[in-house]
């Protein structure tokens, strides 16, 4: 961000209202507002179109990082989204941040009152809402900070026959230029050394995983089948002998049942839990052999006397209805209790003990004084005479005779073909074209 000098004759200044909302993506939501004002004499909304504002924060080593940007509307307002990392809990800014205006072309606009005028500072705090603002009013020059261009592009030429009153000369057609081909160049072959072999380690053989060993499941001991006991055969009894009617019994007075008195159950203080001791292994005994008893022989039927001849007498009392004789109860045979055989115990190996290294005992450092050695005396120099080794003279170099170089004469090249004479060009038009309406005015340049 550079500070440019204010140009002469500039008309600065537009009213800007900066409103920056912080996104509450974290658990601690905050709202940051930056409010700034600017002075201006121009109230047209066209001066704001295309302008853009960015919030640049200064990081280490003097570099600026853009934290947010937004466009300005017709009223001079804009909204920005900035991260909440630059604002602390007490509202102070962790970094130095500045507001920067950009023109419609994207170039930054110069600051008129220096960089400190666009600095964002802390103003106030209301609850979770932090209000920030600018030190001074923002100013910009419409001549330097240009907005969008609203005038339409001019139509050129304005009417037919305005640009070229005379036809253009025909294009020049030059004959083709043929260049004599040069003989090919032969160069001696270059001996390239063989590439250095790259030795790679042999690939590691993949060892297949070990084959799992599956042990057969332990066989469960099935208890012997439970014997089925059949009930004894029913014996048909003779018809009952009618008895004399009994006098009616007095009716029983049924009293209502007494009202039960419910007392709260007494609190039972549970003793401490008894440690569970594993019982010793049970010795399995074979089941007892059932003893079957032979059924008794049925008794012979008793002789039934014929019924006596009834003597009809006038009834004195109404006879009682005969009592119903209930059949004998059916015996309920309960199956013998099942013998539950506990599953076989699986003896697990004892756990592998984990040996931890003994804790290190830190002893205080022991100061050992340095050992000072006595300096040795310098050695006595021994002077020896230099040994002279005579060198043999080198023989003269053997002359190498090379054959003379044979010069091959070259044929002279044929003369170059002469180009045909250039055609005569038409005379150039005058410098200023005479026009009946505008007179001798210079021609207008074409519009880009």
Swiss-Prot record:
Keywords: Cell wall, Repeat, Secreted, Signal. Sequence repeats lie at residues 152-156, 157-161, 165-169, 170-174, 175-179, 183-187, 188-193, 194-198, 201-205, 208-212, 216-220, 222-226, 227-231, 232-236, 238-242, 245-249, 250-254, 256-259, 260-264, 265-270, 271-278, 279-284, 286-294, 295-299, 300-304, 306-311, 314-320, 321-327, 328-334, 335-341, 342-348, 349-356, 357-363, 364-368, 369-374, 378-384, 385-389, 390-394, 395-402, 403-407, 409-413, 414-419, 420-424, 425-429, 430-434, 442-446. Its main location: secreted. Residues 240-290, 306-319, 327-345 have a biased composition (Pro residues). Residues 240-345 are annotated as: Disordered. Mostly expressed in aerial organs, particularly in expanding leaves, stems, flowers, and siliques. Also present in stipules. The keyword Signal applies. It comes from the Eukaryota. One of its GO terms (cellular component) is extracellular region. Residues 1-29 form the signal peptide. It is found in: Secreted, Cell wall. Pfam families: Pollen_Ole_e_1 (PF01190). Residues 152-446 are annotated as: 46 X 5 AA approximate repeats. Belongs to the plant proline-rich protein superfamily. This is Proline-rich protein 4.
């Amino acid at each position: 961000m550079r500070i440019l000098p204010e140009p002469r004759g500039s008309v600065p200044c537009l009213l800007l209202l900066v409103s920056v909302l912080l996104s509450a993506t974290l658990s601690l939501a905050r709202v940051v507002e930056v409010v700034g004002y600017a002075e201006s004499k121009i109230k047209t909304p066209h001066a704001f179109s295309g302008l853009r504002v960015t919030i640049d924060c200064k990081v280490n080593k003097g570099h600026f990082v853009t934290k947010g940007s937004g466009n300005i509307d017709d009223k001079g307002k804009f909204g920005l989204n900035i991260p909440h990392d630059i604002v602390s809990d007490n509202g102070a800014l962790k970094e130095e941040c500045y507001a920067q205006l950009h023109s419609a072309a994207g170039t930054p606009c110069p600051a008129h009152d220096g960089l400190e005028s666009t600095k964002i500072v802390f103003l106030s705090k209301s609850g979770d809402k932090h209000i920030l603002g600018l030190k001074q009013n923002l100013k910009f020059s419409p001549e330097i900070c240009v907005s969008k261009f609203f005038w339409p592009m001019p139509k050129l030429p304005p009417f037919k026959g305005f640009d070229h009153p005379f036809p253009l000369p025909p294009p020049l057609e030059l004959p083709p230029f043929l260049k004599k081909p040069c003989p090919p160049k032969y160069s001696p072959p270059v001996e390239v050394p063989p590439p250095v072999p790259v030795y790679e380690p042999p690939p590691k053989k993949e060892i297949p995983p070990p084959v799992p060993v599956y042990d057969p499941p332990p066989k469960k001991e099935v208890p012997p089948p439970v014997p089925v006991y059949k009930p004894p055969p029913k014996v048909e009894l003779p018809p009952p002998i009618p008895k004399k009617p009994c006098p009616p019994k007095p009716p029983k007075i049924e009293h209502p049942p007494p009202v039960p008195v419910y007392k709260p159950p007494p609190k039972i203080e549970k003793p401490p839990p008894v440690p569970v001791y594993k019982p010793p292994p049970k010795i399995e005994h074979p089941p007892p052999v059932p003893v079957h008893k032979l059924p008794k022989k049925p008794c012979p039927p008793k002789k039934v006397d014929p019924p006596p001849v009834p003597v009809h007498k006038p009834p004195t009392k109404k006879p009682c209805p005969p009592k119903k004789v209930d059949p004998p109860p059916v015996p309920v045979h309960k199956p013998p209790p099942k013998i539950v055989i506990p599953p076989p115990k699986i003896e697990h190996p004892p756990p592998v003990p984990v040996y931890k290294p003994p804790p290190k005992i830190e002893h205080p450092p022991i100061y050992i004084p340095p050992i000072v050695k006595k300096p040795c005396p310098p050695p006595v120099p021994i002077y020896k005479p230099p040994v002279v080794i005579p060198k043999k003279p080198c023989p003269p170099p053997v002359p190498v005779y090379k054959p003379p170089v044979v010069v091959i004469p070259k044929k002279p090249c044929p003369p170059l073909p002469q180009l045909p004479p250039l055609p005569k060009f038409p005379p150039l038009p005058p410098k200023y074209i005479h026009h009946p309406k505008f007179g001798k005015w210079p021609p207008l340049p074409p519009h880009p």
